[in-house]
Amino acid sequence: MRFKGLDLNLLVVLDALLTARNLTAAASSINLSQPAMSAAVARLRNYFNDELFTMSGRERVLTPRAETLAPAVRGALLHIQCSIISWDPFNPAQSDRRFRIILSDFATLVFFEKVVERVAREAPAVSFELRPLDNDPDELLRRGDVDFVILPEFFMSSAHPRAALFDETFVCVGCPTNKQLPRQLTFERYVSMKHIAFRVGGAQMPSIEEQFLLEHGLKRRVEIVVQAFSMIPPMVSGTARIATMPFRLVQHFKKTFPLRIIELPRPLPTFTEAVQWPTLHNSDPASIWMRQIMLQEASRM
């Protein structure tokens, strides 16, 4: 099938190639033989009058033309999938859908475990692929590479729809045996102590609590940066370090680690944990069902 001289089947080939940036991997992802893939690439290069890829050492690099084509091609294929190809009616009890979700260990431990338990009862064949926080979840949503992102709204873009799940507050914690900890810390004492800091996906942007401190002209002394909240309690235990964590997560970890909440002269900020999904999934019955489950479970917290 051709549209204005372009074999539309080649769009699938081009998307696979732009995603994998490797002929063998791209061919495998769409079940093409290596010779068929090479022939398709030659036709694409001829149509666009562009090499599409160049070699930089051992790395295959997109040409400027290919960089421009990548989001347009993926968007076109997603639109066809979500808006033109008709969906089968979604039956949770019979579905084997796998949802790909980016979320933190905080969201997993205090919220998503309940979602998993409920889904296991209502839709036993539905499964999840839980992925760690990423530096650019917006791009993954745009490409349709994930179904949901669960994050504080502070980190979300306005490019995709979202819904608030629950509000949470940060608290400062330390080890109960740390004799340097007074009942209440001044902000000056708080920023001077050794901190364990959580950063979203290793991003350079300030975290919520760091943004709060910057607004008050303060900068804390960070000794250790971690990418999972679950790494904090063992690194606080038996030390003079302190950390800033979501309150519900502190309550969770207090069952297994000695943690003491330390008062500050002013409460640390409250944030809203939210769920975001690709715009093209707005009308996807499976996505709608999953969103309803999450919102219902969040309302019970």
Swiss-Prot record:
A GO term for molecular function: DNA-binding transcription factor activity
Positions of the DNA-binding region: 23-43
Entry keyword set: Activator, DNA-binding, Nodulation, Repressor, Transcription, Transcription regulation
Domain of life according to the entry: Bacteria
Entry annotated with the keyword Kinase: no
UniProt cross-references to InterPro entries, sorted A to Z: LysR-type_TF, LysR_subst-bd, NodD_PBP2, Tscrpt_reg_HTH_LysR, WH-like_DNA-bd_sf, WH_DNA-bd_sf
Domain HTH lysR-type positions: 6-63
Pfam family, one: HTH_1
Main function: NodD regulates the expression of the nodABCFE genes which encode other nodulation proteins. NodD is also a negative regulator of its own expression. Binds flavonoids as inducers.
Protein family per UniProt: Belongs to the LysR transcriptional regulatory family.
Name of protein: Nodulation protein D 3
Species this chain originates from: Mesorhizobium japonicum (strain LMG 29417 / CECT 9101 / MAFF 303099) (Mesorhizobium loti (strain MAFF 303099))
Taxonomic placement: Bacteria, Pseudomonadati, Pseudomonadota, Alphaproteobacteria, Hyphomicrobiales
